[in-house]
Amino acid sequence: MKKSLIATVTLLALCALAAGSFAETKKGEKIDGAKEFKEHCAVCHPDGGNVVNPKKTLKKADREANGIKSTKDIIKNMRNPGPGMTKFDKKTISDKDAKAIAEYVLKTF
């Protein structure tokens, strides 16, 4: 039990560290959703999985089973996540970057 708790806390800390660094983009510059995903999300969601809660992966079937079907749903979950997920506010990930990440998730997983 203690090992599980320590592992979860460690993973959450890694996610928080990953969230601390974000890319600046110039006006009109296309945002690379894959790059942003790798920078902010891949630590906890490698290959679309979920190291904290394996039942909540980014795979289409799991997303839809959890009511996440659109770009808007993904961004909403990034901004106001459930237990175990780091909150990505607008200061951490801009709306444009969040949209690029969400589009990448829908297209890739």
Regions found by a protein language model. Give the residues of each.
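Gly/Gly-Pro-rich "capping" loops immediately C-terminal to redox-active cysteine motifs
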Residues: 30, 34, 46-76
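Short N-terminal segments immediately surrounding and downstream of signal-peptide cleavage
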Residues: 25-42
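The canonical Cys-X-X-Cys-His
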Residues: 38-47, 101, 105
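N-terminal export/targeting leaders of redox proteins
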Residues: 1-28, 109
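Axial heme c-ligation environment in periplasmic c-type cytochrome domains
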Residues: 52-62, 76-109
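Short, surface-exposed, polar/charged, turn-prone segments marking secondary-structure boundaries
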Residues: 22, 70-72, 85-86
